[in-house]
Amino acid sequence: ESLQANPWIEGVDIKREFPHRLVVTPRERVAKVIVYIPADDVAWAVSEKGVWIAPVSLIAGASAEGKPVGPDPKTGQLPEGATMLEGLDAALAAAKMAHALLLTDAPSDVNPKGGKEVTSKVVLAGLEYAKGFSVKFLQQIKDLSIPSVEAISANLNNGVEVSLGAADNIAEKERVVMGLLEKESGVTYVNVRKPGAYTFRSAPL
């Protein structure tokens, strides 16, 4: 019962071994996305199955090399020489360390509860993108902005903004964006809400 009370534990497998031994193996939930709610300056982990897991610590920093670092589990302090991060920057670092996609600009009416299923349509849409994009494309995404379902957009590491809209035709949207970035230079904005009729802007060379 104490294990199952932990929101990071999805369930337990119990195996009986001869003669009188029980082996209990917990099944842990893994964060697929981290949802940052700026109005409350909190971040929550969400599993691939769409369950709010628990709040994520925003005590995060950047090493001298610019890599995200978390606090020491024993002391709660950041490593010596690390730069303290706050707000969105801390949430980005937390998501990187969790190997999860960061969902930003979540509406203030998003109401996380540990161990409960996500009911927010915009968070579920962001989760669908995280599950539908390839690992290669996810590695190029800095964060996913989710103010509303129709206004979902991806901010890429190279500075390009990609307007995605509702979570449909996900693989096709990725294919269009990847192909466009390979073919065109100086792209700053791509609109693939309708991947068959996409538009883009480029910076003047």
Give a label for each model feature.
Residues G11-L205:
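Charged, solvent-exposed interaction patches on well-folded alpha/beta domains
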